[in-house]
Amino acid sequence: MTWAPDNVRKWSALLLLAIIGTALTAATDPGFVAMISQKGLDFACQQGVVELQKELQAISVPDFSGVFKIKHLGKGSYEFYSMAVDGFHIPNPKIEMLPSDGLRVFIKDASIKINGKWMSRKNFLKAGGNFELSIQGVSISTDLILGSDSSGHITTICSNCDSHIDSVHIKISGSMLGWLIRLFHRKIETSLKNIIYKKICKIVRDSVSSKLQPYLKTLSVITRVDDVTSVDYSLLAPLTTTNQFLEGQLKGEFFWRGHRDPLPIHPPVMRFVPNGAYMVCMGISDYFFNTEVLAYQQSGTLKMTLGGQLLSNNGRFQLNTDFLRTFLPKVAKMFPSMGVQLLISAPVPVHLSIQPSGLSFNPKLETQAFVVLPNASLVPLFVLGMKTNASLEVDAEENRLVGEMKLGSRWLLELKESKFGPFKVEYLEDVINYLVSTLVLPKINERLRRGFPLPLPAGIRFSHFTFYPYQNFLLLEADLHLI
C-alpha cells in the first residue's frame, strides 16, 4: 500500500480497553507502543454494554409477600411471584478515562420493565392477576481499574459501583380486587425498587470478575508466530491513562522458541502524537522487526538450499559443472556434467532501518557452492559474498502485520573463498541475480504475506488503517470492527 499523509463475546471489545495500555518506565523502553482514543473507547463501550445489558436483563427477581391493614376492612395479605425482566433498555452508555490507571463507565436514563403475577387474600376472598412494573431513570456508574500481574498479563477489577433509580410505577390488572393492591402501591413499588437496586451492582461486579477478567487471562502475552518464533507482548508496567488516550507499552520482542537469550540491541525511544480521529494507534519500532530477524538468524532458518532439478531445469540457466567450464575449467574436468548445489544464508543479522522515507535495509548474504557427487556427497567449490539494498512495504490484514520485500538493485558479488583457484565473479552475476529474484525472493515474500500477529483481542479486526514512517518506528493508525 502507499504511505498516507494523513460472534465472540462482546466483552472482547472491553478487552481492547486493557490490551493497549501500560506506563513508560525509565528503565525499559518498549518495542511496541499502542494507544486507544476516545473514539476507540466509545466503540468498546458500546459493544461491552451490549453484553452487560444481556446480564442485567437476566436479573432474577425473587418472589415477595406482605400484609396490609385497611381501616374498617381489617388485615389481608398479598404476594408477587413469577417475576421476569421483560426489557432492560440502555440508551446512551458513556466511558471516560480516570487519572492514571482506570476507566469509568456510566449509564443514564436506562429503563426496566418487569412482568409478573400477583395474588391477594382477605378473609375468604382470594384474587389475583398480572402486573407490569416500569422502572425509569436508572443510572449506573462503575470504575474499572486496569493493571498487570507479574507475568505481564492484563488485570482489571471493578473498584466502585453506584446505581440509582428515579421512579417506579406498577400497573395492576386481572381482578376487581386489584384496587386493594393499588391502595398501598407505594410500599410495593419501594420493595421492588430496593430489590432491583441491590441486584444491579452485584451483576456488574460479577460480570467483570466472572467474564471480563477470565477473558483477559485467555489472552496469551507470548504469541506463537510459527514453528520457529514467538513474540512477547507482555506489559512492561502498570496500566495508565492520560486525558486523551489509554496508553500502552509492551515488550514487542520476537524470540526463538525455546531459547531466550539477552539481545545485543535495544528499543529506541518512540515519541509521537496520535490522531484522535482513529480508534487505535500503534507504534512499531525497528527493534520489533530486528528481533524478528535475530530470532530467525539464531535458529539457523535464514538459509535456503538450491539444487537438483531446481537449478538444472530452471528454464534460463542450467547450473551444473558444464556451466562452470568458462571460469572453473578444472571443476568441469574433474566432475563432468554433475549437478551443482547452492546454499544461500545470512551469516550476520540484517538490520532494518525505519526513516520518514520508509523501511529499508542492506542485506548481506553468503552463497556456498558445492558439486553433488553421484553418491550424494558434496564437494565444496567456492563461497560468494552478496550485498544489495532493499525495502520493505508493510500492510495490515485482519489482525496481522504483513509485508513485501523489494530489491532496490542487483546483487553485488565478492569471491570470499575458492577451493579451485580465483575467478571473476562477473561470470556468476546474471545467474545469481536471476536465481535470487525467481526462487529466493518469492519464498521470503510468501512468508511475509502470511504475516505476524498484532496484539488485538479475539473478535477484533482492523479497518480503515494507514501507516506513517518516523525515525526508528512505524506508526499504524486504524479503526476497528467486530467479526
From Swiss-Prot:
Residues 464-483 are annotated as: Central sheet, part 3. Disulfide bonds join C161-C201. The gene is Bpi. This is Bactericidal permeability-increasing protein. Residues 221-285 are annotated as: Central sheet, part 2. The 199 N-terminal fragment fused to gas vesicle protein C (gvpC1) of H.salinarum, when incorporated in gas vesicles (GV), increases the survival rate of mice challenged with lethal concentrations of lipopolysaccharide (LPS) and D-galactosamine, if GVs are administered before challenge. Expressed in testis, epididymis, and bone marrow, as well as in Sertoli and promyelocytic cell lines. Upon stimulation with different TLR ligands, it is strongly expressed in granulocytes and in bone marrow-derived dendritic cells. It is found in: Secreted; Cytoplasmic granule membrane. Pfam families: LBP_BPI_CETP (PF01273), LBP_BPI_CETP_C (PF02886). It comes from Mus musculus (Mouse).
